Amino acid sequence: MLCKCLVTCLDYKRPVPEKQSFFKNHVKNLSILIDNTPSLPYYENQRTAMPLKRKVFHMEVILGIDIGGSTTKIVGLRTDGSVLSMLRVRAEDQVTSLYGALGNYLTSNGLTLKDVRRVVLTGVGASYVEGDIYGLPTCKVDEFSASGTGALALSGQDSAVVVTMGTGTAFMWAEKGGTVRHLCGSGIGGGTLGGLCRKLVGMERFGQIKKLAAQGDLGQVDLTIADITCNPAPTLDPTLTAANFGNLAEDASPADLAAGAVNLVLQAIGTMTVLACQCCDTRTVILTGSMTTLDQVKPNFENFEKLYGIHYIVPENATFATAIGAGLCSLKKNAVD
């Protein structure tokens, strides 16, 4: 009989739930199931007990790979759409990041090239890749379709404004069934945050900025409504920002500056989500991308929710939404060879 072992994925450690359809459990299964051949010789005919050549069992894995401006995200999907595991790799150039992510993923999960049914590329860096990767069938999905499909699948929504907060920020309208429409984009995003913090505090790595900003005091950086009036409008909370970096103290610490930069970027994105919702006549926004892991995301978008009545959703594994969507689009035959 086949024995099955569970190998915990690289980025996440949690109890492994029962294998379910991707659309039912919204990617809560974050481990990979590998079929191993028996340790003893395989006997096809138990009566003769003649040892035959061991049978090797291969999985059929679809790899969705999102090649972004600074990081590459890779997700393995079973043919039923359920997630195997996820991995994120940073590299100086996108092609190196792609091949590094693929090799790392296969090794970490005990897979071989024969286990891969198809590679599906998306993201800005996909344009630099031509032909098949390592001889594997390779196709491409446009980033907007992948982002919209992944966001809806992860959140369980039928329609929503989808915001991908990557190096820049993209705004889309997505509907269940494959309709994804690009609304607009903004140059303000993770790249903005990295550039500002490199100049302000000498850091540009996302993990470093995230840790530093969590210790900062916005009162040392931003001007609030309470700072400029004692009689604000009834609908406005006095603690809301009136001007980003409008009250910069001379003794502001690096942590304060980092917090101010994070606040500026998130509030700019939040303002654009309000306009996008008005354009699409909706009050549901799904936030995806690496920046969703910032501690300041929740309080910032809670303020927008109170002000404008918009429901913001940050689904589990939002960082990998586009890579997951690429794989799902491939299963729906929306990929381009």
List the predicted regions and their residue ranges.
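Short glycine-rich, Thr/Ser-proximal phosphate-binding strand/loop in the N-terminal lobe
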Residues: 61-100, 180
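Short beta-strand-loop/turn "lid" adjacent to the catalytic site in phosphate-handling enzymes
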Residues: 85-91, 107-143, 180-181
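Glycine-rich phosphate-binding loops at beta-strand->alpha-helix junctions
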Residues: 121-127, 275-278, 282-304, 319
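Conserved phosphate-binding catalytic cores of ATP/NTP-utilizing and phosphoryl-transfer enzymes
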Residues: 129-163, 168-178, 324-330
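Conserved phosphate-binding/catalytic loops in two-lobed NTP-binding clefts
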Residues: 137-144, 302-325
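Glycine-rich phosphate-binding/hydrolytic loop that grips phosphoryl groups
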Residues: 149-154, 193-197, 312-337
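Glycine-rich phosphate-binding loop plus the immediately following alpha-helix
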Residues: 178-230
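Adenine-nucleotide phosphate-binding core of ATP-dependent small-molecule kinases
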Residues: 234-284, 319
